[in-house]
Swiss-Prot record:
This is Mu-conotoxin-like Cal 12.1.2a. Its main location: secreted. The modification 4-hydroxyproline is found at P23, P40. Keywords: Bromination, Disulfide bond, Hydroxylation, Ion channel impairing toxin, Neurotoxin, Secreted, Toxin. It comes from the Eukaryota. It comes from Californiconus californicus. The modification 6'-bromotryptophan is found at W37, W38, W44.
Length: 45
């Protein structure tokens, strides 16, 4: 499947990867991070 982004060489499939202290600074989702896109929903290869 298609990767939205890579972090540490791993694939992010949910479109967004965020840190609590930078919720919009390192997000792959074009709409910016929202609660529903927070890290616990991230799926790794």
């Amino acid at each position: 499947d298609v990767c939205d982004s890579l972090v540490d060489g791993r694939c992010i499939h949910n479109g967004c990867f965020c840190e609590r202290d930078a919720p919009n600074g390192n997000c792959c989702d074009t709409d910016g991070c929202t609660a529903r896109w927070w890290c616990p929903g991230t799926k790794w290869d």
